[in-house]
A protein has these predicted regions:
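Active-site bordering "gate/hinge" segments
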Residues: 131, 165-197, 205-543
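Terminal low-complexity/charged segments
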Residues: 1-210, 369, 373-380, 387, ...
Length: 543
């Protein structure tokens, strides 16, 4: 692979290339950015067809962007494509929205928070903040005075969302075209609707009962978590990570801990590694049970939801005994675990594994084999493997389309290399495949837990870091496999006790982008079911 990468990198014009911990950093001038992106995406040697994220940066004297890229055939390879501009008044880069289907949302996010324009992107509306918001919050010189942005007393006018502005260097505010075609019948779905699974606003245009277009609107519970991280010490960031995807809180927290531990070169005791892995897999099972039950309830099967919550409650009780918390376990900390496991931890888990295997069979009998439910799910909401990669759909959604993207297999962390399990794949890419694969993953999680729970090493449960943690200057990336896919943490440190920049990669944001692509052509009655099959979590998107 190294020789192939060298061949690809040799095609880049005037690029500075470095490698640290198998992460390649490529720095190019802004006039060469588009050519570099095209080369990485379209070359015939190693195609970087997976755009994991676009990270906006304020370097004080300049503004920049970082494209986090990997080839879908070898996700262990990470390339950070960086570029900067000294023009803080009118910062602009060429768009890459035609190269990756994930790019439009990412570019809108960078524009929203940094004011960077992406020339050629036809939709440069703000994506989290109101369209009338003044300033760019993640810039270092941002003025947060409430006088500039007072608390609004009225809802945002929907007309503000209707027009797509052209963002070039000459005429910034010119209205280019409407989101929908003239005469379209548009339905507002959410943000206060139980089937959106959170405060998500979807504007849906219809031709009769058939969906023509879906326009998602985020930000109703945007909390500025990445901005808060910049004024928080590293141990404080852990509590913010829990509150992104709250159904994968322990897994997200694990990712932040590993990023920090990697930076300060702190070795975590084996006992903590095993317990972290078990907690992560219990969290995954709990999330999948809730996702399974919620999707079934969206389709009218309330009994399935009740059964899913009943089974999930057993996991919550295990968490409560050992961690003290339920949904927010607050268990992993820098160096290991907050406390050692409860004396009943292993006994309770072994009982749960036996119970859950029996219940999985019951769940399949109850709902999977139901001919009405199966008839609604099969042949609906097709997502091809190529689309999944270009949109960046990882986790169960990506694997249901035949893409092997499980971080636990690609880059084993904690104690995953001590357990044998299968990263389940399905080839259909339909709603039924996305439904079924989560039940399969519960079985694989039970296998992992079963292999580890009787082999938890003796010894300390935590390695004690310094009271005030300071990461050495540099960039740190850590990714984990949470219940919805590749959750990545990017930390840029200047050697201080506060991070200079923190970026969380939201797998749920990508899943709403999937909905935007698979919903057209389906009936409006199936929109709720399609969203349920994707299992996105809104606080993870809004951050």
């Amino acid at each position: 692979m190294c020789n192939k990468l060298e061949q690809v990198f040799s095609q880049l014009a005037n690029a500075e290339i470095s490698n640290k911990d198998n992460v390649y950093t490529i720095v190019v001038a802004k006039e060469n950015l588009r050519q570099a992106a095209e080369t990485l995406r379209n070359n015939d040697i190693v195609r970087f067809d997976f755009l994991r994220d676009i990270i906006g940066m304020d370097y004080t004297d300049s503004l920049g962007v970082i494209y986090n890229l990997s080839p879908s055939e070898d996700l262990s390879v990470i390339v950070l494509l960086e570029s900067r501009t000294d023009d803080r008044e009118n910062p602009a880069f060429d768009t890459v929205e035609d190269l990756w289907l994930s790019a439009p949302f990412y570019e809108r996010e960078v524009h929203d928070f940094f004011g960077i324009r992406f020339l050629g992107n036809p939709d440069m509306r703000r994506i989290f903040l109101r369209q009338d918001w003044r300033g760019y919050p993640l810039r270092k010189d941002y003025d947060s005075s409430p006088i500039i942005n007072p608390i609004p007393l009225e809802n945002e006018d929907l007309d503000a969302l209707e027009y797509l502005p052209v963002l070039d260097l000459k005429d910034i505010d010119k209205e280019r075209k409407s989101v929908f075609d003239k005469g379209d019948f548009v339905v507002n779905f959410g943000p206060q609707h139980p089937a959106t699974h959170g405060v998500l606003h979807l504007r849906v245009s219809l031709d009769g009962e058939v969906i023509k277009k879906v326009d998602p609107n985020f930000g109703y519970i945007h909390r500025g978590i990445e901005k808060i991280c910049e004024v928080s010490m590293y141990h404080q960031i852990l509590h913010l990570a829990d509150r992104l995807d709250y159904l994968s809180g322990s897994i997200n927290r694990h990712a932040v801990c590993m990023a920090i531990e990697k930076g300060i070169q702190l070795e975590v005791p084996p006992r903590a590694q095993y317990v972290r892995t078990i907690i992560d897999e219990l969290t995954r099972i709990a999330s999948h049970l809730l996702g399974w039950g919620a999707m079934a309830m969206d389709m009218g099967a309330i009994t399935a939801f009740v059964y899913g919550m009943r089974d999930r409650e057993k996991i919550m009780k295990i968490f409560e005994k050992t961690c003290g918390g339920r949904l927010m376990a607050n268990y992993s900390m820098i160096g290991g675990l907050m406390e050692d496991i409860h004396p009943d931890f292993q006994k309770d888990i072994k009982e749960f594994v036996v119970y859950m295997r029996k219940m999985l069979r019951e769940h399949h009998i109850l709902f999977t084999g139901n001919p009405i439910a199966r008839g609604r799910m099969e042949g609906v909401g097709h997502l091809t493997r190529e689309q999944a990669i270009s949109i960046g759909a990882t986790g169960p959604v990506g694997r249901a389309s035949g893409w092997q993207c499980d971080v636990r297999k690609i880059e084993p962390y904690a104690a995953y290399d001590k357990a044998e399990f299968t990263a389940v794949l399905r080839e259909g890419g339909m709603t039924f495949d996305r439904y079924y694969i989560r039940l399969d993953e519960i079985e694989e999680s039970l296998k992992i837990i079963e292999q580890l729970v009787d082999n938890i090493p003796e010894g300390p449960f935590c390695a004690k870091p310094k009271p005030i943690v300071k990461l050495p200057e540099g960039e740190y990336i850590q990714r984990v496999e949470n219940a919805r896919g590749d959750f990545s943490v990017y930390i840029n440190s200047r050697g201080d006790k506060f991070p200079y920049r923190v970026k969380f990669r939201s797998p749920s944001m990508v899943l709403v982008n999937v909905l935007k692509h698979i919903a057209p052509g389906n009936k409006i009655a199936d929109l709720i079911m399609l969203g349920g099959s994707l299992d996105y979590v809104i606080p993870c998107i809004d951050r």
